[in-house]
């Protein structure tokens, strides 16, 4: 495993009045000039050990990672009452992070992916649509997407959560069997099966058994009250760490991004 250097940086969002977003950049010290990179988007509660766990395995596979603190830049404390009102308004953060990485000398601008968790997973899915991507990039898009438990019940049911007409890039969608935002392990399968064939073939779905929301967040063992829980009925949602499933998700992430950001380039 190569050593990794840590850098604390500031990312400028692409809002009309840009936000200055604190972020942690990790760069593998493996002697290579340019690396693929993955942006890791936190959930409603803000930055956590979860993102660092994924960064560890991606760095070990030779990828740069960038973890932002999107809430502090807005003076928000996190949670259902302390997050932005809409996910759409945070897309300027994500594309600002992409611009930051594309300009970084250690990064190959053509090989940038994104993984997001919960709220961040929703942003990841939005960025995969041609509609939202075109609002920031006239040419190009992220090379790979990995949304993790992004409340799949919301898609194509509420305004601004339209999912379809996807950019030409692979997606690994990870959900939890016991996630109480969806309240049905078939929800994610129904979403994917309802897409056009062109979009369906871009998506690999993994439903993690015995897994609640936040199954990959070390130390999570709590109940939260969220109006988006229980398919929009609101109420209590269990968040519980499952170390075995977390380890499996890390392995899936490393394999997915390596295949699509590292190995794919080697084959071309």
Task: Write out the residue ranges for each language-model feature.
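Short substrate-entry loop that stabilizes the transition state in hydrolases
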Residues: 31-35, 40-77, 154-155, 180-185
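Cap/lid segment of the alpha/beta-hydrolase catalytic domain
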Residues: 45, 49-52, 57, 70-89, ...
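Alpha/beta-hydrolase-fold catalytic nucleophile elbow
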Residues: 69, 115, 145-149, 174, ...
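C-terminal catalytic histidine-bearing segment of alpha/beta-hydrolase fold enzymes
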Residues: 202-268
């Amino acid at each position: 495993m190569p050593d990794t250097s840590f850098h604390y940086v500031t990312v400028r969002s692409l809002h009309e009045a840009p936000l200055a977003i604190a972020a942690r950049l990790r760069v593998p010290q493996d002697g290579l000039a340019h690396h693929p990179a993955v942006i890791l988007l936190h959930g409603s509660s803000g930055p956590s050990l979860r993102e660092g766990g994924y960064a560890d395995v991606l760095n070990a596979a030779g990828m740069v990672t960038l973890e932002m603190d999107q809430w502090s830049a807005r003076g928000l404390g996190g949670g259902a009452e302390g997050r932005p009102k809409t996910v759409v308004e945070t897309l300027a953060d994500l594309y600002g992070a992409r611009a930051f990485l594309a300009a970084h000398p250690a990064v190959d601008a053509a090989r940038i992916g994104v993984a997001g968790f919960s709220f961040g997973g929703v942003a990841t899915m939005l960025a995969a649509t041609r509609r939202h991507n075109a609002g920031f990039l006239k040419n190009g898009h992220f090379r790979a997407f990995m949304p993790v438990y992004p409340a799949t019940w919301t898609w194509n049911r509420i305004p601004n959560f339209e999912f379809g007409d996807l950019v030409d890039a692979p997606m690994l969608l990870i959900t939890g069997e016991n996630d109480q935002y969806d309240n049905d392990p078939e929800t994610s399968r129904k979403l994917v099966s309802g897409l056009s064939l062109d979009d369906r073939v871009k998506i690999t779905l993994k439903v993690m058994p015995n897994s609640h929301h936040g199954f990959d967040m070390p130390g999570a063992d709590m109940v939260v009250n969220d109006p988006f829980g229980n398919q929009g009925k609101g109420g209590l949602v269990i968040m519980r760490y499952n170390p075995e499933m977390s380890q499996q998700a890390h392995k899936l992430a490393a394999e997915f991004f390596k295949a699509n950001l590292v190995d794919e380039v080697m084959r071309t």
